[in-house]
């Protein structure tokens, strides 16, 4: 998905949203990519009573909201400013909101109609495990105590279904209510890209609100999985970290879990899927364990579920060999090899020098013997030569 700047909507309350002299203002940041955005109020000087809710990804774009509770004022000059920054698109937006008392006359407040309905995909593990039941979830938030119950309708590829399970609405920390409906679905319906629609209706809504979701379109690509043991710098601490790197997969729906000697481990954290420049995704998972448990030789396994994998599952294990430190062992082996090499070189040089000395001594002895023989032969031949000269006529 390409970088998309957010649209920012100021949310002013109606009279029902006010409690005594306090009023809650909101700021909706919609349709941006990628994360993150930052939301502050009055450039950060207003921090009390601020609640910023997690971003929700829908149709490859993010939406989040932030609210602040402030004293109400009939004076329009007293404004509150919502400051939104989206670094990825270099976007900065400031929206002013006037906390007016809607009960006064002749003041008439108009509140923009903003959807409070969200739809969520099934968990990847539920989709890829045949014994589990995947569910698409529809959530309605910020329901007033005086609002009537909401009604949910569900559609699969525009065909209405009646198998959803709707929970009783629950009161939230800010005295509003939340209502949730879950639709159990078939594993293959999600994997095959069917479209799921949630329609919400209430007497408090001017019209029904619809939200639609389906699996990200595109050819699945299996992830590459790598496990990384603790770095030697961590071995001086009581706890060490094991890392699992999962790269080059598509779509982003993935489940990463850890096991310890075949049993589920709990003390791990996963990053959210992060998009590569080629459109694939990668994830890191970190498992913290006691150093003593690592040094005891226990087996730790990184388990990955993704639709691109054969049987949708793969895993990689790692364990510590007692007394083995890779860097130290390599260094010791290298030192041993060097010592052995120098010993071999020394012996070779010594034997070479001895061979040269021996050859030189033998050669010298032979030369001396030959020279002596030649001299002796010469002395024998000279008198005979002289006698032959004297006998000549």
Swiss-Prot record:
Q: Which residues cross the membrane?
A: 340-357
Q: Where is this region: CH1?
A: 1-97
According to the record, the residues making up region (CH2) are: 111-217
Q: Where is this region: CH3?
A: 218-324
Glycosylation-annotated residues? 174
Q: Which parts form a coiled-coil structure per UniProt?
A: none
GO biological process terms held by the UniProt record: antibacterial humoral response; antibody-dependent cellular cytotoxicity; B cell differentiation; complement activation, classical pathway; defense response to bacterium; humoral immune response mediated by circulating immunoglobulin; immunoglobulin mediated immune response; phagocytosis, engulfment
Q: Which UniProt keywords apply?
A: Cell membrane, Disulfide bond, Glycoprotein, Immunoglobulin domain, Membrane, Transmembrane, Transmembrane helix
Any one GO CC term of this protein is:
cytoplasm
Q: Which InterPro entries match?
A: Ig-like_dom, Ig-like_dom_sf, Ig-like_fold, Ig_C1-set, Immune_Resp_Modulators
Chain spans, region Hinge:
98-110
Q: What is its main location?
A: membrane
Which CDD domains does the protein's record reference? IgC1_CH1_IgEG, IgC1_CH3_IgAGD_CH4_IgAEM
Gene3D superfamilies in the cross-refs: Immunoglobulins (2.60.40.10)
One GO molecular-function entry: immunoglobulin receptor binding
Q: List the disulfide bonds.
A: 27-82, 138-198, 244-302
- In this entry, the parts of the chain located on the Cytoplasmic side of the membrane are 358-393
This protein's membrane topology, according to the annotation, is: Single-pass membrane protein
Localization per record: Cell membrane
| A Pfam family this chain is assigned to | C1-set
Q: What is this protein called?
A: Ig gamma-1 chain C region, membrane-bound form
Q: Which organism is it from?
A: Mus musculus (Mouse)
Source organism phylogeny: Eukaryota, Metazoa, Chordata, Craniata, Vertebrata
């Amino acid at each position: 998905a390409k970088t998309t700047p957010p649209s920012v909507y100021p949310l002013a309350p109606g009279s029902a949203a006010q409690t005594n002299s306090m009023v809650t203002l909101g700021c909706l940041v919609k349709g941006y990519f990628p994360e993150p955005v930052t939301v502050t109020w009055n450039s950060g000087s207003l921090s009390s009573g601020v609640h910023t809710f997690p971003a929700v990804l829908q149709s490859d774009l993010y939406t989040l909201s932030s609210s602040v509770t402030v004293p109400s004022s009939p004076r329009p000059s007293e404004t509150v400013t919502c400051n939104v920054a989206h670094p990825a698109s270099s976007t900065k937006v400031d929206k002013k909101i006037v906390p007016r008392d809607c009960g006064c006359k002749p003041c008439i407040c108009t509140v923009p109609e903003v959807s409070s309905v969200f739809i969520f995909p099934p968990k990847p593990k539920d989709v890829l495990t045949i014994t589990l039941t995947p569910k698409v979830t529809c959530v309605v938030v910020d329901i007033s105590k005086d609002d009537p119950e909401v009604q949910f309708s569900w559609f699969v590829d525009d065909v209405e279904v009646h198998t959803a399970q709707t929970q009783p609405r629950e009161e939230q920390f800010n005295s509003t209510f939340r209502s949730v409906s879950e639709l159990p679905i078939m594993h293959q319906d999600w994997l095959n890209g069917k479209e799921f629609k949630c329609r919400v209706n209430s007497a408090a809504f001017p019209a029904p609100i619809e939200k639609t979701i389906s699996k990200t379109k595109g050819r699945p690509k299996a992830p590459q999985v790598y496990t990384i043991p603790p770095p030697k710098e961590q071995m001086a601490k009581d706890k060490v970290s094991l890392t699992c790197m999962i790269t080059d997969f598509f779509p982003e729906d993935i489940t990463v879990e850890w096991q310890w000697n075949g049993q589920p481990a709990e003390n791990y954290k996963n990053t959210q899927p992060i998009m590569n420049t080629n459109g694939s995704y990668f994830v890191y998972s970190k498992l913290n364990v006691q150093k003593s448990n690592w040094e005891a030789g226990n087996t730790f396994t990184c388990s990955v579920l993704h639709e691109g994998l054969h049987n949708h599952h793969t895993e990689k294990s790692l364990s510590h060999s007692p007394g083995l430190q890779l860097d130290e062992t390599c260094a010791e082996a290298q030192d041993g090899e060097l010592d052995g090499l120098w010993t071999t070189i020394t012996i070779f040089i010594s034997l070479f020098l001895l061979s040269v000395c021996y050859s030189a001594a033998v050669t010298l002895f032979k030369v001396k013997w030959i020279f002596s023989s030649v001299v002796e032969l010469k002395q024998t031949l000279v008198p005979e030569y002289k006698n032959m000269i004297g006998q000549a006529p």
